């Protein structure tokens, strides 16, 4: 007995709604092997998950794929988290994946975090223990695979920055069971080379299993106990290993490690030239400033030197002498004029000038001028003064007018 006849679309929608309402299918965690992997240009990822007996189609949209911590590959065992639903257009159900993790990787992460916490408590990560990276290394020791991309990158970067730096390469395994041992041996060997300034411990990117050799406890202690500073450049920027926390400097890539270890010769030359230029300018400015001070003090010294003081005093004396002469001359001229005026005045009142007109002067014997006849009565002798001489006379008589 049929309850209702449905269209294909109605059937697919009904199945979709039924699946979407199921709690388990909406919180599915599915383990399987990746196959038919396709990464679309839009960023969406399409693939299948399979096991020994079956498979299911999967899709992971770009917004979720962006947060993946590892690159997907066919044959990779994963655990996919998401929800099962129907693609109505095709009538097929598939797993819509929201997150994914590597199958079996969980145990490695637990071991990683456990060792990390242990070494942290023991002080291997303390900044106080980290050695200073030398600025001008002449010889760099490199521990890595002699055939990998890492050593090529390190060589290229070092040659580009400074062809004068020598690289001493210790060939080591960088993954596998014996890798940690060869890395430890490399550290010990390069520590014995006296002129090695710094060590780079490096390898290219890889999965957590491929990088696991760098999460070894003995290797961590070898890095910690190294007398020479160690830069680690393991994997890509997002990859962190135990020795990255122990090393003196962690670089995101092998190339970046070489950038840190090898100083750029051209940059150094330019810096030296800039320092030289700045020092030259500074010295010229200092010399100019001191010369100005010197000239100023020289002027002050010259202005206050005994020679200049004496010369100034001589000039002052000459000026005073000239002024004195002028004043004396002026005073003499003034007095001369006064004398001339008084002489003229005296000359005008000189009694002798009257005598030139025919007059005479009468004096007694005491040279006292006699102006009245009464004075003659008591005198016997008088002096008569002429314009050109004098005569002594005796008085015989006095006649009244």
From Swiss-Prot:
Keywords recorded for this protein, A-Z: Cytoplasm, Exonuclease, Hydrolase, Nuclease
InterPro entries, per the entry: Exonuc_VII_L, Exonuc_VII_lsu_C, OB-fold_nuc-bd_dom
Pfam families: Exonuc_VII_L, tRNA_anti_2
Keyword rRNA processing on entry: no
Subcellular location: Cytoplasm
Reaction catalyzed: Exonucleolytic cleavage in either 5'- to 3'- or 3'- to 5'-direction to yield nucleoside 5'-phosphates
Hydrolase is among the record's keywords: yes
Class of the enzyme per the UniProt entry, highest EC level: hydrolase
GO cellular component terms, semicolon-separated: cytoplasm; exodeoxyribonuclease VII complex
GO BP terms, alphabetized: DNA catabolic process
Molecular function per GO: exodeoxyribonuclease VII activity; nucleic acid binding
EC number assigned by the record: 3.1.11.6
Signal peptide per UniProt: none
Subunit relationships: Heterooligomer composed of large and small subunits.
Family designation: Belongs to the XseA family.
Function of the protein: Bidirectionally degrades single-stranded DNA into large acid-insoluble oligonucleotides, which are then degraded further into small acid-soluble oligonucleotides.
Protein name according to UniProt: Exodeoxyribonuclease 7 large subunit
Species whose genome carries this gene: Clostridium botulinum (strain Loch Maree / Type A3)
């Amino acid at each position: 007995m049929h309850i209702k006849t449905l269209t294909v679309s109605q059937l697919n929608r009904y199945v979709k709604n039924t699946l979407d309402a199921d709690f388990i299918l909406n919180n599915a965690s599915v383990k399987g092997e990746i196959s038919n992997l396709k990464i679309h240009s839009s960023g969406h990822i399409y693939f299948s998950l399979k096991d020994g007996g079956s498979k299911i189609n999967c899709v992971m949209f770009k917004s979720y794929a962006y947060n993946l911590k590892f690159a997907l590959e066919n044959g990779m065992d994963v655990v996919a988290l998401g929800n099962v639903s129907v693609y109505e257009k095709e009538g097929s159900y598939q797993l819509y994946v929201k997150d994914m993790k590597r199958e079996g990787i969980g145990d490695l992460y637990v071991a990683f975090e456990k060792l990390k916490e242990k070494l942290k408590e023991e002080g291997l990560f303390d900044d106080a223990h980290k050695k200073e990276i030398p600025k001008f290394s002449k010889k760099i020791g490199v521990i890595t695979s002699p055939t990998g991309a890492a050593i090529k990158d390190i060589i290229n970067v070092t040659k580009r920055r400074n062809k004068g730096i020598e690289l001493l390469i210790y060939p080591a395994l960088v993954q596998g069971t014996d890798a940690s041992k060869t890395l430890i041996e490399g550290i010990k060997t390069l520590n014995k080379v006296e002129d090695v300034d710094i060590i780079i411990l490096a390898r290219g990117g890889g999965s957590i299993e491929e990088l696991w050799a760098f999460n070894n406890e003995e290797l961590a202690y070898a890095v910690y106990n190294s007398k020479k500073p160690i830069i680690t450049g393991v994997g890509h920027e997002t990859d962190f290993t135990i020795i990255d926390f122990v090393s003196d400097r962690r670089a995101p890539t092998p190339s970046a490690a070489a950038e840190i270890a090898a100083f750029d010769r051209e940059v150094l030359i330019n810096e030296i030239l800039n320092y030289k230029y700045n020092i030259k300018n500074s010295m010229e400015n200092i010399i100019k400033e001191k010369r100005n001070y010197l000239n100023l003090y020289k002027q002050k010294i010259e202005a206050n030197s005994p020679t200049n003081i004496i010369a100034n005093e001589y000039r002052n004396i000459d000026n005073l002498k000239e002024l004195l002469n002028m004043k004396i001359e002026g005073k003499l001229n003034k007095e001369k004029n006064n004398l001339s005026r008084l002489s003229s005045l005296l000359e005008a009142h000189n009694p002798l000038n009257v005598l030139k007109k025919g007059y005479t002067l009468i004096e007694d014997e005491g040279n006292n001028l006699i102006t009245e006849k009464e004075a003659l009565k008591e005198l016997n002798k008088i002096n008569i003064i002429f314009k050109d001489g004098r005569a002594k006379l005796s008085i015989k008589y006095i006649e009244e007018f």
